[in-house]
């Protein structure tokens, strides 16, 4: 398919599912700050006036889960019931147990980096040369819109913006290359007092036209701003929120593939998270090295076993050397045992809260170690010897 439209979406930090992700990762970070060896599988549910934190956590850290949850809600901006939630008055229920001893046996640390994977599963990493961050344009722009919208809200540019919001961007491809943005959808929660026309003008002029580079938008680009008309009831009052329910927003916006495992609330012994980060690291370095224009990497694990059961590279026909050579180069350059991933990407740190909103990939912050192009030369050298 050469000529087509492709759409991705993102959601703001005030979306109830993203609130849940941020609370789960806030708790993970609080534990890792005290106990880097803590085992965390933390799930969060939000509904009207209530936060429920559940899961399996084994740690020596002393963390006030309720306090962490309230701090996250406060930082997002839910500080009054008329916004759909209030960190001061919401209930917080804690239902946390310890990690199963059967799982713990499989992931115990050894001196030889042969710590077993925390579960079976398959993980994907993807990269494409459409943006400087080597991410698909549709998801990169979707994230930028809701992130910039939150910045406008927190800067008090207007007094009627509320935390809950969604974005959606449709990109037109010609001969497989992104050419223009065909449509932009923005739905933002707002105060009841503001008119639809005021919302539409502000979002068009202060958000869309300032956030998206002008070369992507033309006179035919369609803008849909709060297309239902009103969006007053939002946050957990409008919809329940749950950790791990925005896995496509978290990754590549529907491009590439997804193995099904969520990220937030999981320590790096869970390959759902660490191996997905490693797969992105591989794919980004392949594309960054100019070895392919587009790349998808799959890895898979058996619980309690360190070495992946499979590694697969798909170059979509954009590589001169082919996927088999790329796969051999990956095996030479990258150690995909979970303990090595954790060490190589320095994952036993409280670095996860920023990942829980606006995407885990395509970010420039220093703590996003899986975004570094630090294996480019090694991959090039490996390909030379193999081709």
Curated annotation (Swiss-Prot):
InterPro entries: ADOMET_SYNTHASE_CS, S-AdoMet_synt_C, S-AdoMet_synt_central, S-AdoMet_synt_N, S-AdoMet_synthetase, S-AdoMet_synthetase_sfam. Mg(2+) binds at residue 17. Its EC number is 2.5.1.6. GO terms for molecular function: ATP binding; magnesium ion binding; methionine adenosyltransferase activity. It is an enzyme of class 2 (transferase). Binds 2 divalent ions per subunit. Belongs to the AdoMet synthase family. This is S-adenosylmethionine synthase. It comes from Bdellovibrio bacteriovorus (strain ATCC 15356 / DSM 50701 / NCIMB 9529 / HD100).
């Amino acid at each position: 398919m050469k000529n087509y439209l492709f759409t991705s979406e993102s959601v703001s930090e005030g979306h109830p599912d993203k609130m849940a992700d941020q609370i789960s990762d806030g708790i993970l970070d609080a534990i890792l700050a005290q106990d880097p060896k803590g085992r965390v599988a933390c799930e969060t549910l939000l509904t009207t006036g209530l936060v429920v934190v559940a899961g399996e956590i084994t740690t020596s850290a002393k963390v006030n889960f309720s306090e962490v949850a309230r701090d996250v809600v406060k930082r997002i901006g839910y500080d009054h019931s008329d916004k759909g939630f209030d960190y001061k008055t919401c209930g917080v229920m804690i239902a946390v147990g310890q990690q199963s001893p059967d799982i713990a046996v499989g992931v115990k640390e050894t001196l030889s980096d042969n710590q077993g994977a925390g579960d079976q599963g398959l993980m994907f990493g993807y990269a494409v040369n459409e943006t400087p961050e080597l991410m698909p344009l549709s998801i990169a722009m979707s994230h930028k819109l809701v992130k910039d919208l939150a910045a406008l809200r927190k800067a008090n540019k207007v007094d009627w913006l509320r935390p809950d919001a969604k974005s959606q961007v449709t990109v037109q491809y010609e001969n497989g290359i992104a050419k223009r943005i065909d449509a932009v959808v923005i739905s933002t929660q707002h105060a009841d007092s503001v008119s639809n026309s005021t919302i539409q003008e502000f979002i068009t002029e202060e958000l869309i036209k300032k956030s998206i580079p002008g070369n992507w938008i033309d006179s035919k680009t369609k803008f849909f701003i709060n297309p239902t008309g009103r969006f007053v009831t939002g946050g957990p009052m409008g919809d329940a929120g749950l950790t791990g329910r925005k896995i496509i927003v978290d990754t590549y916006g529907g491009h590439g593939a997804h193995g099904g495992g969520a990220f937030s609330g999981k320590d790096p012994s869970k390959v759902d998270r660490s191996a997905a980060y490693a797969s992105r690291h591989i794919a980004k370095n392949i594309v960054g090295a100019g070895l392919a224009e587009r790349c998808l990497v799959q890895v898979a694990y058996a619980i309690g076993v360190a070495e992946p059961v499979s590694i697969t590279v798909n170059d979509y026909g954009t590589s001169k050397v082919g996927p088999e050579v790329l796969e051999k180069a990956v095996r030479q350059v990258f150690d995909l045992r979970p303990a090595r991933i954790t060490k190589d990407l320095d994952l036993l740190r409280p670095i996860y809260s920023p990942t829980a909103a606006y995407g885990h990939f395509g970010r420039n912050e220093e703590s996003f170690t899986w975004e570094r192009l630090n294996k480019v030369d090694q991959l090039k050298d490996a390909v030379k010897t193999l081709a």
